[in-house]
């Protein structure tokens, strides 16, 4: 048997084991594990053009972008400002 066949068989066996474990879970456990918790603020790219550098902190719960982002150049404590001004999750 080729090594690619062996690898494929291993992947299938692991998948079947994972599927079997999911089958044993109760509905309550699935509901709890499927919740996605987003932070109030995220480190994002605000500079124009193509940039991979995150240069500001933005609140995900405010409506307008001007009111919700703090650039690190203008505000050295942008992270603290964001978390202080962003409303908590309900």
Curated annotation (Swiss-Prot):
Keywords: Developmental protein, Disulfide bond, Signal. Disruption phenotype: No visible phenotype, due to redundancy with ESF1.1 and ESF1.2. Simultaneous down-regulation of all 3 genes by RNAi induces embryo abnormalities. Pfam families: ESF1. The keyword Transmembrane helix does not apply. Residues 1-22 form the signal peptide. It comes from the Eukaryota. Disulfide bonds join 41-58, 46-86, 56-82, 59-69. InterPro entries: ESF1_brassicaceae. GO terms for biological process: embryonic axis specification; suspensor development. Expressed exclusively in ovule embryo sacs and in early developing endosperms. Belongs to the MEG family. Maternally-contributed central cell peptide regulating suspensor development and correct auxin distribution in early developing embryos. This is EMBRYO SURROUNDING FACTOR 1.3.
């Amino acid at each position: 048997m080729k090594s690619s066949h062996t690898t494929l068989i291993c992947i299938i066996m692991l998948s079947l084991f994972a599927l079997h474990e999911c089958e044993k879970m109760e509905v309550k456990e699935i509901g709890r594990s499927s919740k996605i918790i987003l932070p109030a603020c995220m480190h994002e790219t605000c500079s124009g053009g193509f940039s991979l550098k995150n240069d500001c902190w933005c609140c995900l719960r405010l409506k307008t972008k001007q009111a919700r982002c703090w650039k690190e150049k203008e505000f050295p404590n942008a992270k603290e400002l964001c978390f202080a001004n962003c409303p908590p999750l309900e």
